[in-house]
Amino acid sequence: MIPPDTQTELPFLAGVDDEGEPIFESLSVTAVDEEQGLVRLLRSPLFARNLASGDRIKVINAATAEYRLEERSGNLSIRVFSKEDIDPLAETLTPALEKIDGALDLRHERALVYSIHYSIGFQEIEDTLNDALKDYPYAVWYYGNVYDPEDGTTPIGWWLDIDEQ
């Protein structure tokens, strides 16, 4: 296992290729509890679904990318994809999300990933995203951990469980 407070990269399933072979995304984690095999995600993923920065995960088998989500951090994962260079959009969107406590986790030439706590409010987050993207018709945003990974449309509702605590 990974010693506590140690940072490392672990493979997470990101999808499958045209031949049905798995594709993995390497994600940064820090060990939380070596004995129980618990790690915490340091950044929201670009492709791996149903996860966000700060989520606590139990490592079942790192070699085969088997994990179990133990506890959600309350962060939403927001993925922005662009058909063109992302820099102009990033210069607009990043400060707008930072104003409502969002954080840029990943910047790629055609994608951005942000984390923001759900308590900010879905409407405020979505309004901020839509306002920033209105001048960039070649870009689109998605939540990475709000919808069922199987159908991509059914809200999971994990934030309701946190609200009840």
Residue ranges and their predicted role:
Residues 70-84, 112:
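Short glycine-/aliphatic-rich beta-strand segments at the starts of folded cytosolic domains
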Residues 86-165:
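Helix-rich terminal scaffold detector
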Residues 1-21:
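Extended boundary segments
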Residues 23-31, 44, 64:
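Short beta-strand-centered aromatic/proline hotspots
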Residues 33-43:
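Short, structured beta-strand/loop micro-motifs enriched in basic residues and often containing a Trp
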